[in-house]
């Protein structure tokens, strides 16, 4: 089995200090290392519960990666990894964005130290003010014929206007390395709009979250991806915009209570996307 480091990872853990990072194979599978503490166990437990939960509607299952169990992987010191669907396997030049949801990223019963660590990030980003923060993104810059990805520390400093600008950049055709140019949002209607676009998918998720009380998705992310190459070739219908939920290390049982933290962030994020669709040509302030 040939494994390699993912080309387009925009957020999450990477190989560091002797600890393995995620890997992908050529069969459309993504290998995610189990975190050594309870987080790895919680994420496996969630996937096992969710994948067999008949209370979750079939059309909602498609917003989550397919789970293939766990496996010890050679070359990673035999570390156990979750085997998931590689969400980018079918994309040639994917543009990808990771958005952490909720106005609070810690979970009930977390230690005071962990709460303070999360609170520092939450208050210093758009998490508290907008109910989400952009953790990472990468787009294919066709003018430069290369992928462009900002440093994570720059994203951590985004305010509300910066988040709005970044969501425009994600669907723009002009060069993103040129900081003096305004994003043109040229791909907004192809990616965010339409009957199969990002907004439609987010609204379908919102309908479910307005009623579901099975799980609370603490510190979970929405991953958005689309095929940049198809748009550049003029085939907007093959942009294949896709929304997936990822990162479930802090998911807890819902205990019959609506997940207002995630739902509130989702509603806010939907408003940002809808605003861009309503005014795609609007010049955004830098």
Swiss-Prot record:
Region annotation Disordered: where it falls in the sequence: 1-22
State the superkingdom. Answer: Eukaryota
Q: Which InterPro entries match?
A: IPK, IPK_sf
Question: What is the enzyme's main class?
Answer: transferase
An additional note in the Swiss-Prot or TrEMBL entry is:
Does not bind calmodulin.
What Pfam families does the annotation carry? IPK (PF03770)
Which keywords does this chain's UniProt record carry?
ATP-binding, Cell membrane, Kinase, Membrane, Nucleotide-binding, Nucleus, Transferase
Recorded catalytic activity of this chain's protein: 1D-myo-inositol 1,4,5-trisphosphate + 2 ATP = 1D-myo-inositol 1,3,4,5,6-pentakisphosphate + 2 ADP + 2 H(+); 1D-myo-inositol 1,3,4,6-tetrakisphosphate + ATP = 1D-myo-inositol 1,3,4,5,6-pentakisphosphate + ADP + H(+)
Q: What is this protein called?
A: Inositol polyphosphate multikinase alpha
Question: What GO molecular functions are on record for this protein?
Answer: ATP binding; inositol-1,2,3,4,6-pentakisphosphate 5-kinase activity; inositol-1,3,4,6-tetrakisphosphate 5-kinase activity; inositol-1,4,5,6-tetrakisphosphate 3-kinase activity; inositol-1,4,5-trisphosphate 6-kinase activity
EC code: 2.7.1.140, 2.7.1.151
GO biological processes? embryo development ending in seed dormancy; inositol phosphate biosynthetic process; pollen development; pollen germination; pollen tube growth; pollen tube guidance
Q: What is the effect of changing residue 98 to A?
A: Loss of kinase activity
Taking the first listed entry, what is the main subcellular location of this protein, grouped into a coarse class? nucleus
In which family does this protein belong, per the annotation?
Belongs to the inositol phosphokinase (IPK) family.
Function, as annotated, reads: Inositol phosphate kinase with a broad substrate specificity.
The portions of this protein that span the membrane are none
Its localization reads: Nucleus; Cell membrane
Gene behind this protein: IPK2a
A GO CC annotation recorded here is:
plasma membrane
Post-translational modification here is noted as: Phosphorylated.
Q: Which PANTHER family match?
A: INOSITOL POLYPHOSPHATE KINASE, INOSITOL POLYPHOSPHATE MULTIKINASE ALPHA
Tissue and organ expression note: Detected in leaves, stems, roots, siliques and flowers. Highly expressed in root tissues, anthers, the stigma, pollen grains and growing pollen tubes.
Induction text: Not induced by auxin.
């Amino acid at each position: 089995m040939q494994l390699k480091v993912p080309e387009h990872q925009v957020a999450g853990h990477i190989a560091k200090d002797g600890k393995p990072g995620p890997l992908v194979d050529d069969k459309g599978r993504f290998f995610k290392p189990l975190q050594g503490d309870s987080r790895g166990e919680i994420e496996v437990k969630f996937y096992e519960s969710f994948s067999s939960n008949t209370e979750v509607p079939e059309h909602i299952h498609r917003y989550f990666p397919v789970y293939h169990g766990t496996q010890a992987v050679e070359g990673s010191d035999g570390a156990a990894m979750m085997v998931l669907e590689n969400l980018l396997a079918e994309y040639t030049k994917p543009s990808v964005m990771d958005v952490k949801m909720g106005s609070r990223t810690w979970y009930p019963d977390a230690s005071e130290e962990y709460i303070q660590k999360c609170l520092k990030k939450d208050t210093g980003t758009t998490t508290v003010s907008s109910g989400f923060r952009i953790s990472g993104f990468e787009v294919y810059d066709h003018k430069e014929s290369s992928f462009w990805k900002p440093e994570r520390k720059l994203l951590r400093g985004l305010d509300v206007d910066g988040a709005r600008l970044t969501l425009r950049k994600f669907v723009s055709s002009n060069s993103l390395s040129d900081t003096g140019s305004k994003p043109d949002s040229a791909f907004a209607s192809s990616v965010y709009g339409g009957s199969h676009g990002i907004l439609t998918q987010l609204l379908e998720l919102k309908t479910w979250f307005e009623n579901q009380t099975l799980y609370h998705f603490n510190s979970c992310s929405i991953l958005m991806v689309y095929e940049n190459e198809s748009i550049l070739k003029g085939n907007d219908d093959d942009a294949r915009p896709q929304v997936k939920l990822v990162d479930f290390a802090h998911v807890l049982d819902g205990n019959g209570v609506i997940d207002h933290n995630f739902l509130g962030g989702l509603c806010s994020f939907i408003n940002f996307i809808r605003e861009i669709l309503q005014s795609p040509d609007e010049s955004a302030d830098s």
